[in-house]
Amino acid sequence: MKEILITNDDGFEATGLLALKEALSELDGVNVTIVAPSSEKSACAHSLTLTRPLRFIKLDDNFFKLDDATPSDCVYLALHALYNKKPDLVISGINHGANLGEDITYSGTCGAAMEGVLQGIRSIAFSQFYENNSLNELGFELAKEVVKFITPKVLNDEISLNPREFLNVNIPATTSKNFKGYAVVPAGRRTYATHATLNRNPRGIEYYWLGNAALEYEKGEPSDISKVNEGFATITPIKLNMTSYESLESLKGKFDAK
């Protein structure tokens, strides 16, 4: 029996999480444990909670929410408190929205996969791309097919992942009928506009809402961004070693002792 730990950043009631659970329940020989945040934690990246205690709340057999926790908290604490032996796989998702290009650095979905990798466990992040608030209409049927296609390949070692790497998978905003297939591509490059909306509360105190600016991307070589827009499910291996080897040697010449 293969053990899979799943979490997300949209919270324990998210339809994407339940779709992931349903998809994995259709696979033979797997046992799934869910530990998810008690509320939405989008864009919390790889943050851990170090300034207050965390509490498991059991919802069902093998289904827990972690009170006011981040996705990385869920992975970290599940491994230390619920497992005597490490699970075979950590899966994060299915995220409500894509995690493309530099989204990966903000994403709590990807942050949970990073935590799994840091703990020595193979990990996958799944995200469902959608447009114009169409997620309810689109649903997760194609995403579930993608999960059922990719997950066994990782579990059965058909896909070899290097240590400290995880797979970032984005599902296109289309149906199974119009699905183009799979594209293994690098992460693209987003162009982020700085945007914040200023408001005032009834006492006249100012506050801001961040975000809501349109996201663009740099066109050129095929990437996760371009291919998911063409109807492909994109698969991008992400490594945690962030050293810029291109600059390493030139910097050594300027700073190393003579």
Curated annotation (Swiss-Prot):
InterPro entries: SurE, SurE-like_Pase/nucleotidase, SurE-like_sf
UniProt keyword list: Cytoplasm, Hydrolase, Metal-binding, Nucleotide-binding
UniProt EC number: 3.1.3.5
Binding site for a divalent metal cation: 9-10, 42, 95
Subcellular location: Cytoplasm
Catalytic activity: a ribonucleoside 5'-phosphate + H2O = a ribonucleoside + phosphate
Sample GO molecular function, one term: metal ion binding
Enzyme class: hydrolase
Cofactor(s) annotated in UniProt: a divalent metal cation
SUPFAM superfamilies, sorted: SurE-like (SSF64167)
Domain of life: Bacteria
Pfam families, alphabetized: SurE (PF01975)
Family classification: Belongs to the SurE nucleotidase family.
Protein name according to UniProt: 5'-nucleotidase SurE
Organism: Campylobacter concisus (strain 13826)
Encoding gene, per UniProt annotation: surE
